[in-house]
Amino acid sequence: MRWLECLVWPGQPERLRRLRGAVAIARARPADVFSGDLNETVAELVDAAPEEATVVVFHSAVLAYLSVEERVRFERTIRGLPCRWLSNEGCGVIGSVADQLPMPAKDTPGRFVVALDGVPLGYAGAHGQTLDWFRRSPIR
């Protein structure tokens, strides 16, 4: 916990309060953690969800660590699953999302793109500190 607290930037007491609150929740109800190949494991987990559930697969700053081929495979995998796909990745990380941006990725240094089901909705700060919606409605 002390290490995590050290990662909160000075002068941000609200973030420190949120971190401590989140840690308290996590300690009370620890998350299930699964390991394995991203593409295979995500498919298994989505398939295991109750049929009546709306499954949301969310990732942030994950796909940049995969090869381009693995990213393309992930997109094919996720689009074939009965789920909503919410991503928060660097502007050029998901090629099909980058192709839909209102300005080239090179014009948005340090920004991430929030996308729902592969449709970009807005630019976000890399640590979630800002969110600027595009003109179209973020909800569909």
Locate the predicted segments by residue.
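Short, glycine-/Ser/Thr-/acidic-enriched flexible segments
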Residues: 38-40, 62-64, 92
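A short SAM/SAH-binding and catalytic strip from SAM-dependent methyltransferases
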Residues: 55-68
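A cross-taxonomic marker for long C-terminal extensions/tails that follow the last structured domain
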Residues: 101-140
